[in-house]
Amino acid sequence: MITLTGHTLTIEEMKRLLLEGEGVTACPTSMQKVAECREVVEKIVEDGKVVYGITTGFGKFSDVLIQKDDVKALQHNLIQSHACGIGEPFPEEVSRGMLILRANTMLKGVSGVRPLVVNMLLEFVNRKIHPVVPQQGSLGASGDLAPLSHLALVLLGEGEVFYKGKRVHAMVALTEEGLEPIELEAKEGLALINGTQAMTAQGVLSYIEAEATAYQAELIASMTIEGLQGIIDAFDENVHKARGYKEQVEVASRIRDILHDSKLTTKQGELRVQDAYSLRCIPQVHGASWQVLNYVKEKLEIEMNAATDNPLIFDGGEKVISGGNFHGQPIAFAMDFLKVGMAELANISERRIERLVNPQLNDLPPFLSPEPGLQSGAMIMQYAAASLVSENKTLAHPASVDSIPSSANQEDHVSMGTIASRHAHQIIQNVRRVLSIEMICAMQAAEYRGIENMSTVTKSFYHQGRQQVPSITNDRIFSTDIENIAHWLKTNYSIKERLDVNAAL
């Protein structure tokens, strides 16, 4: 059980919450702050003060005063009118993450909602009632209005949810669980939908997958080094310490650990003086991607614990301030950076695939074919990899350089952070498939070199991979092999555990 405080949530905890289904509870101290802040809102309503988002309309209607008797209707109208999401729904892990992150930000005690609202969010998490939230429709400022409105709908008993493996009306799940829908009061509608929790939840899932995919890339690259009899000297610690990037040093260290007892690697000058960049520069390129991952993790953990709605309430109600914490620019930049960092892992992987299948670049059978000419072997697998990396180049175009005004030009600059976050996740799926192709080719090359000569780590990984796909003894439908390896990597490594040297043993 993870305790939410509004301040301390980490990526490691989100792994447990999103992927292992662990439950959540609220810190009592934080809940007390929520209750105290709510008292301020109720006094504002009772006194008839004019405060944006509490006793006024929204966006361009911020100058319209709402009468006390209409406050509840205002909240309901807000949620319904803003539930304009379109397209396929986010994965359940993302909508679960949205619930968790929305509750966590409210626990900071500056949003002005009742404890009842926080508790309802936590009930949905713990009972695994996950909102159906369409992926498209957010500009990333004022936060993720459309996606979060679909989240808010289910608290009211409207909209759809994923529940017990089915997509059902929210009231079906609420009734079965013995829960009553809530009626939103002053400020609560805006507090639920004004924030960055869709882009951040998708970003967290993307980061978790990206982190493990980067570890996998090192192990698969190590198999390729063996298949091409690569020069191990390029990974010498002195070389990488001389440059000074810790991530580069760490990648080189892991490669050395993986290959420490391999009989397939060579020494400088033994077969050739130096390798091509796609082998020799693995620590430099993969290490740079790790720099991106570290940056992204830092920004996500800040945003996971951020107050991102508007207005915010401070000093016991002395300050009720309209700000712009809902603007998703920090996450938009981070997700665009993640797109580039991950796409590059596929770029260099595709070049290693080319070196494995091109007979002009190695002494292996052409395209790793068992009968070159009669059988094409891995020829078109390289085509598929080339297609995926080219698609990634399009997806990697930064979403954050775009903006379009909305709400009659009141909201005249937006982040497009949710688009960036969605595209990052799509790129990661493509990267995994490219790495799957490299793994299939590297395993085949290892058979020609002699499996018994592989390192202890790569040999173990090879045997696990062969449980997913057989050797290439005849041409067959290779798309099935690629998807089998990709699914295996994702379900057994990429979102379950970090892949380090020991994970392969």
From Swiss-Prot:
Catalytic reaction equation(s): L-histidine = trans-urocanate + NH4(+)
5-imidazolinone (Ala-Gly), cross-linked positions: 141-143
EC number: 4.3.1.3
Listed GO MF terms: histidine ammonia-lyase activity
Enzyme class, spelled out: lyase
Keywords on record: Cytoplasm, Histidine metabolism, Lyase
An annotated GO BP: L-histidine catabolic process to glutamate and formate
The keyword Cytoplasm is annotated on this UniProt entry: yes
GO cellular component, one term: cytoplasm
Intracellular or extracellular location(s): Cytoplasm
Matching InterPro entries: Aromatic_Lyase, Fumarase/histidase_N, HutH, L-Aspartase-like, Phe/His_NH3-lyase_AS
UniProt pathway annotation: Amino-acid degradation; L-histidine degradation into L-glutamate; N-formimidoyl-L-glutamate from L-histidine: step 1/3
Gene3D superfamilies for this protein: Fumarase/aspartase (Central domain), Fumarase/aspartase (N-terminal domain)
PROSITE patterns: PAL_HISTIDASE (PS00488)
Post-translational modification: Contains an active site 4-methylidene-imidazol-5-one (MIO), which is formed autocatalytically by cyclization and dehydration of residues Ala-Ser-Gly.
Annotated positions of the 2,3-didehydroalanine (Ser) modification: 142
NCBIfam families assigned to the protein according to its UniProt record, in alphabetical order: hutH, PRK09367.1
Family label: Belongs to the PAL/histidase family.
Official protein name in the record: Histidine ammonia-lyase
Organism in which the protein naturally occurs: Bacillus cereus (strain ATCC 10987 / NRS 248)
